[in-house]
Protein backbone atom coordinates (compact mmCIF):
# COMPACT_ATOMS: atom_id res chain seq x y z
CA UNK A 1 0.00 0.00 0.00
CA UNK A 2 2.87 2.34 0.73
CA UNK A 3 4.46 1.69 -2.66
CA UNK A 4 1.15 2.48 -4.35
CA UNK A 5 0.94 5.81 -2.54
CA UNK A 6 4.53 6.64 -3.50
CA UNK A 7 3.77 5.75 -7.12
CA UNK A 8 0.69 7.96 -7.13
CA UNK A 9 2.54 10.89 -5.56
CA UNK A 10 5.40 10.50 -8.05
CA UNK A 11 2.98 10.49 -10.98
CA UNK A 12 1.12 13.55 -9.70
CA UNK A 13 4.33 15.49 -9.07
CA UNK A 14 5.64 14.48 -12.50
CA UNK A 15 2.52 15.68 -14.33
CA UNK A 16 2.32 18.90 -12.30
CA UNK A 17 5.97 19.74 -12.96
CA UNK A 18 5.55 18.84 -16.63
CA UNK A 19 2.49 21.12 -16.88
CA UNK A 20 4.27 24.00 -15.12
CA UNK A 21 7.39 23.59 -17.28
CA UNK A 22 5.33 23.43 -20.49
CA UNK A 23 3.28 26.47 -19.47
CA UNK A 24 6.34 28.56 -18.62
CA UNK A 25 8.24 27.52 -21.74
CA UNK A 26 5.35 28.02 -24.19
CA UNK A 27 3.80 31.14 -22.67
CA UNK A 28 6.35 33.74 -23.91
CA UNK A 29 6.35 32.23 -27.42
CA UNK A 30 2.55 32.28 -27.63
CA UNK A 31 2.15 35.71 -26.02
CA UNK A 32 5.21 37.84 -26.88
CA UNK A 33 3.40 41.10 -26.12
CA UNK A 34 2.05 40.11 -22.70
CA UNK A 35 4.29 41.34 -19.90
CA UNK A 36 1.64 41.68 -17.18
CA UNK A 37 2.46 38.29 -15.66
CA UNK A 38 6.03 39.26 -14.87
UniProtKB/Swiss-Prot annotation:
Keyword entries, A-Z: Chloroplast, Membrane, Photosynthesis, Photosystem II, Plastid, Reaction center, Thylakoid, Transmembrane, Transmembrane helix
Cell membrane listed as a keyword: no
Single GO biological process annotation from the record: photosynthesis
Membrane topology: Single-pass membrane protein
Pfam families: PsbI
GO terms under cellular component: chloroplast thylakoid membrane; photosystem II reaction center
Residue ranges of the TM segments: 6-26
Location within or outside the cell: Plastid, Chloroplast thylakoid membrane
Similarity comment: Belongs to the PsbI family.
Function: One of the components of the core complex of photosystem II (PSII), required for its stability and/or assembly. PSII is a light-driven water:plastoquinone oxidoreductase that uses light energy to abstract electrons from H(2)O, generating O(2) and a proton gradient subsequently used for ATP formation. It consists of a core antenna complex that captures photons, and an electron transfer chain that converts photonic excitation into a charge separation.
Subunit text: PSII is composed of 1 copy each of membrane proteins PsbA, PsbB, PsbC, PsbD, PsbE, PsbF, PsbH, PsbI, PsbJ, PsbK, PsbL, PsbM, PsbT, PsbX, PsbY, PsbZ, Psb30/Ycf12, at least 3 peripheral proteins of the oxygen-evolving complex and a large number of cofactors. It forms dimeric complexes.
Protein name per Swiss-Prot or TrEMBL: Photosystem II reaction center protein I
Gene symbol of the encoding locus: psbI
